[in-house]
């Protein structure tokens, strides 16, 4: 860069940063999410932001179009050394030049690699949660980011994994969103075996089933007419297309949908996989009910497929009622062979994911959530006179030891300006101590919301503040 050139210090497109009030909201929601995850016994882990590219590409090509590749930017002397190291393929750091690296685009594929690396150190079924950042090289637009925080849970087993783990997922989703208090939401549940089995029974060939499922999964985005067109482009006949449309539009209560599915199997050929999917769906639904999730929170939706190739059984999508345009706010499902890519053995798993950065952005824009105060401080001890600073420090520390968040104002300025500063930061209470109050071991406690001001003995100050905060 030439001397005098201006540096563009704006953030790259799609890489968000947060003001204090926004970051505090994210941390508040993270606390709720972690608390619910841990109440079900999920344990935290962290995986690297960077993985070998071959790891991220290990299960199909679902991530190829969104993977961010990276490579170190070496100074000229290091680059020359690396260029000279062509015979060994390594530079002085020991890095192999041919090893392509990339930023993780989700948490599930890195989890599979993590389990493969630590197989003998983990206890199975292994239930973990992560709240890391992920990175996607897709076009940035409103509500979609290239870097965002994703909150995931997964349970993985060595051989068999009970379907009751699948049933826990809607219960966990329900507890989180009820605690956040975002309004009415609906968890839509399906099973990929139901879709795959039905497609087989109406004569869709094996090589076309995945692409047809992906088309059906886009029903809400592109509409029924476009789905029909796309299916016909895949070589699906008009009669088959209509059967598929009629199938994914089956609705009613959970029990009504299950009854309709069972009745359907009586009139179709090759229904073994379809029947297995229905049986799994029944088991999961029974578990969801036993966990206390009410039916206004979940339904069976046969159009839900989840586009990622690795899902093989139960799948979930959650929508906010009245705000369906926001899209899915939590999704996931069961996979059977994802971890086996690295180990060569069947290791079934089930999990869900909340794209927290996207969710916060959407809910703030829709007015469903509001940011928090710019500071966690609940009290400001104002600066009336410099010679009383030792008293202000002692009072501040006494309040902190009582569990109250406190800012001590070290700058001397007019009292009204100090009140304005506290109010601007969202601080509700100011503690005022002048020479007379200090001599009498008293303070004035001012509520900036109501304007009320009361006299309180210093020995009772923490108790009074806590009473008013509650």
Curated annotation (Swiss-Prot):
Pfam families: HGTP_anticodon, tRNA-synt_His. Signal peptide: none annotated. GO terms for molecular function: ATP binding; histidine-tRNA ligase activity. Its EC number is 6.1.1.21. The keyword ATP-binding applies. It is an enzyme of class 6 (ligase). GO terms for biological process: histidyl-tRNA aminoacylation. Residues 69-99 are annotated as: Disordered. Keywords: Aminoacyl-tRNA synthetase, ATP-binding, Cytoplasm, Ligase, Nucleotide-binding, Protein biosynthesis. Residues 79-94 have a biased composition (Basic and acidic residues). It is found in: Cytoplasm. Coiled coil: none annotated. GO terms for cellular component: cytoplasm. It catalyses: tRNA(His) + L-histidine + ATP = L-histidyl-tRNA(His) + AMP + diphosphate + H(+). Belongs to the class-II aminoacyl-tRNA synthetase family. Homodimer. This is Histidine--tRNA ligase.
């Amino acid at each position: 860069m030439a001397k005098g050139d201006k540096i563009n210090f704006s953030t790259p497109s799609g890489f968000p940063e947060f003001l204090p009030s926004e970051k505090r909201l994210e941390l508040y929601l993270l606390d709720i999410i972690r608390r619910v995850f841990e109440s079900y016994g999920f344990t935290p882990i962290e995986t690297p932001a960077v993985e070998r590219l071959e790891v991220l590409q290990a299960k199909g090509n679902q991530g190829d179009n969104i993977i961010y590749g990276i490579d170190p930017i070496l100074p000229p002397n290091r680059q020359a050394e690396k260029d000279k190291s062509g015979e060994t393929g390594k530079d002085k750091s020991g890095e192999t030049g041919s090893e392509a690296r990339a930023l993780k685009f989700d948490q599930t594929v890195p989890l599979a690699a993590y389990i493969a690396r630590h197989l003998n150190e983990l206890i199975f079924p292994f239930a973990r949660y992560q709240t890391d950042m992920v990175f996607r090289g897709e076009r940035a637009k409103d509500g979609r980011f290239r870097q965002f925080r994703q909150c995931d849970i997964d349970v993985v087993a060595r051989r068999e994994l009970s379907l009751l783990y699948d049933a826990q997922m809607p219960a966990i989703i329900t507890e989180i969103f009820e605690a956040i208090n975002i309004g009415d939401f609906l968890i839509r549940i399906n099973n990929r075996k139901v879709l795959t089995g039905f497609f087989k029974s109406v004569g869709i060939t094996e090589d076309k089933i995945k692409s047809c499922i992906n088309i059906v999964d886009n029903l809400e985005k592109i509409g029924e007419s476009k789905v029909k067109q796309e299916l016909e482009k895949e070589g699906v006949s008009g009669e088959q297309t209509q059967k598929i449309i009629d199938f994914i539009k089956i609705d009613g209560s959970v029990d009504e949908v299950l009854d309709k599915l069972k009745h359907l199997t009586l009139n179709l050929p090759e229904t073994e996989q379809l029947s297995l999917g229905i049986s799994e769906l029944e088991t999961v639904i029974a578990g969801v009910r036993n966990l206390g999730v009410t039916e206004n929170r979940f339904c069976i939706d046969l159009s839900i497929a989840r586009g990622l190739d690795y899902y093989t059984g139960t799948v979930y999508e959650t929508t906010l009622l009245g705000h369906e345009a926001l899209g899915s706010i939590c999704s996931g499902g069961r996979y059977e062979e994802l971890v086996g890519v690295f180990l060569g053995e069947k290791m079934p798993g089930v999990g869900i994911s909340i794209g927290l950065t996207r969710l916060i952005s959407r809910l703030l824009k829709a007015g469903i959530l509001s940011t928090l105060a710019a500071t966690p401080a609940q009290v400001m001890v104002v600066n009336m006179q410099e010679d009383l600073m030792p008293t202000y420090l002692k009072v501040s520390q006494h309040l902190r030891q009582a569990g109250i968040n406190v800012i001590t104002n070290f700058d001397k300025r007019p009292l009204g300006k100090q009140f304005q500063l506290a109010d601007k930061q969202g601080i509700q209470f100011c503690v005022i101590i002048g020479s007379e109050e200090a001599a009498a071991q008293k303070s004035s406690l001012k509520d900036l919301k109501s304007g009320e001001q009361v006299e309180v003995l210093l020995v009772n100050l923490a108790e009074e503040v806590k009473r008013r905060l509650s």
